[in-house]
Amino acid sequence: TYEVTQSSYTTERFPWPEMRLTDLYLLYAEALNEKDDANNRELAISYLDQIRARAGLKGIKESWDTYSRYPNRYKTQEGLREIIQRERAIELMFEGSRFWDLRRWKTANKVLNEKIHGWNFEGETPAEYYSQRTLYTLKFIAPRDYFWPIHQNDLVVNPKLVQNPGW
């Protein structure tokens, strides 16, 4: 809820856990694929197909066999991993899970260190406006940023604790 005044507003936050069945299906498919067994891969594909069917899309096998440049991608562990990661990025877009997925997959240092490009919105001519420029660069330092620092008080209380790398 919020109240608006002439110069300011106040907000109240109500945190609650939010998880959709789709997220659980995607996590389960990811876990099944990591087991690296043909039967598990088939089961993982069946869960992905349920998600795609809800969205009105064809299943993984039919889609990749028909439309992909790499029709055999879903037949290998690595290929299905890429498919699952892409499905997660699309299905859970703007829900706040991408950063945590990148950390879990250990790809954050690659993806988050890319330059963010955009148009020159201050340009006065079409040529200036549509010219691409770097807006900003993110900085994710591996392995440090995959872990959080252990609070100094905890290190003092328990001298057997060791600070995480980079902190």
Can you say where each PLM-predicted feature lies in the sequence?
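Acidic/polar-rich alpha-helix caps and helix-coil junctions
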Residues: T1-W167
